[in-house]
Amino acid sequence: MMILQVNQLSKSFGADTILNNIKLEVRNRDRIAIVGRNGAGKSTLLKIIAGQLSYEKGEIIKPKDITMGYLAQHTGLDSKLTIKEELLTVFDHLKAMEKEMRAMEEKMAAADPGELESIMKTYDRLQQEFKDKGGYQYEADVRSVLHGLGFSHFDDSTQVQSLSGGQKTRLALGKLLLTQPDLLILDEPTNHLDIDTLTWLEHYLQGYSGAILIVSHDRYFLDKVVNQVYEVSRAESKKYHGNYSAYLDQKAAQYEKDLKMYEKQQDEIAKLQDFVDRNLARASTTKRAQSRRKQLERMDVMSKPLGDEKSANFHFDITKQSGNEVLRVQDLTISYENQPPLLTEVSFMLTRGESAALVGPNGIGKSTLLKTLIDTLKPDQGTISYGSNVSVGYYDQEQAELTSSKRVLDELWDEYPGLPEKEIRTCLGNFLFSGDDVLKPVHSLSGGEKARLALAKLMLQKANFLILDEPTNHLDLDSKEVLENALIDYPGTLLFVSHDRYFINRIATRVLELSSSHIEEYLGDYDYYTEKKTEQLELEKMNQQEETDKTPATVKSDSKRSYEEEKEWKKKERQRLRRIEEIETTVQTIEENISRNDELLCDPEVYQDHEKVQAIHADNEKLNQELESLLSEWEELSTEED
């Protein structure tokens, strides 16, 4: 079913054309990513589709009964309600129905036989409608979203207005997810999410019953969630089938194909023109030359494929090599003034050439640890020891090292006054600051431009140990790839914090998982880390199961169970645990089937066959309904108490 059509849409800001003849189609259960460079017009397009911006030309066609939900970047809720109360406002209509049902129940209790039948019919209709709209499920849905987005540990009395900006944005996302619109429009939904929350959101969106339109710079997320990609480049859009990786492959293959066709035509043109030039003046060949010239005139000459827009181009060098041991942290305890310790007795070591990713939930203290390592914060106790010849370069995710009042050129030149202006300008050019861009004040730059400027300063430092705090924040997808390639070739040592799992996978040789009291080390990339975490969880589950089997029967608070009661309780407990295992196995199979179906939808032979696509969507719909029912049963069984 068609949910939305965008036809020949154009948008300008002043003399600048941002979008030109954009075409986009959204069908039910489509998962569409809009990608492109920073400033390409992705967010502008989402705002137009959501009805928050006007446009000059084109049309947007949407059936009247289709609902849309839009989450803009940096959107946050501000309310005096508690976190849970705010999310429950989504279901005010169900609470009103529930109240009406309670009133009718009281009426039925007091009604005479003549009225009762009529009231019961009305009550049955209302109860069925309440059930169909999720009346018996919505509180569980709220709990699930609160848990998934990392709010389960908050006190029930926590008010929305007391949350940080990032937490308010997360809550706004949760509220939007609960509304279940037919078309979910998300602009950078992965901002402010830690890795656990990102994983939960991926699973949630994979099973979402409506269509999704996303702008995101998280490649791992896009690979997991989307099945179509629209690239916005040079104000125009182009559609690709499959996830983000498939889009990259198709784009590269199309460019190579177009380039070969262009070069072949250019060779043909050159040969024809050469024949005309050599033979036009000769009487014996004039007619043939004129024929070739007409052939040239009739030819539809191809434009040279443009390929990608200009990319940043940089690399990180070092002035001198460090000793083998680069950093040793021993029993480090860190706290803020008048606060309990954030980190306690943390220890780890880095050697030359390692690339270590520091991961952990939001608020655990990752950035605090990095700031302590560079001496911006002082530890309460413990030691930080650097090896011989270690020089440290630090990248701050908030770009606090930049001076907002300076010009871009001066920001670098003041730091390295010994370098000639030409070299400074060349360096800035490598980071896409050209011409008058270098004369802009720093405060006028976008987040992505500030990130590139901070990286330019870091490059000139030539330190042999780089400590990076969220270096991919604000960078577009292309700039992330350039940064990755530069860091892969970097001859020094790396310690970095990042929520970008694709980035971690490419860069990390070791993952350090930070908790409040220690660091757990994993010798591999992100995929290795997640594999080991899964193994650990499965092992813990097995151990808990064994403990449960060994544990003596629970004693009732008022009296001991009789032998028969004990026997019956054990029987039911075994049945409950067996059913949990059955559900978990079935859920895994269903999720694999959904994933397999999503992969099929990326196959050209399938997505070009409309009947096959409809059949797969119908199968996924059925699988998702079954999955929802099983997960609901699993939750009930898991929380069941004697």
From Swiss-Prot:
Q: Which residues form the signal peptide?
A: none
**Residue ranges constituting the ABC transporter domain according to the UniProt record:** 4-259, 327-541
Named from the GO MF annotations, one term is: DNA binding
Q: Give the UniProt keywords, A-Z.
A: ATP-binding, Nucleotide-binding, Repeat
- InterPro entries for this protein: AAA+_ATPase (IPR003593), ABC_tran_C (IPR032524), ABC_tran_Xtn (IPR032781), ABC_transporter-like_ATP-bd (IPR003439), ABC_transporter-like_CS (IPR017871), ABCF_ATPase (IPR051309), P-loop_NTPase (IPR027417), Val-tRNA_synth_C_sf (IPR037118)
Disulfide cross-links: none
Q: Which residues bind ATP 1?
A: 36-43
**Which family does this protein fall into?**
Belongs to the ABC transporter superfamily. ABCF family. YdiF subfamily.
Q: What is this protein called?
A: Putative ATP-binding protein YdiF
Q: Which organism is it from?
A: Bacillus subtilis (strain 168)
Q: What is the lineage of its organism?
A: Bacteria, Bacillati, Bacillota, Bacilli, Bacillales
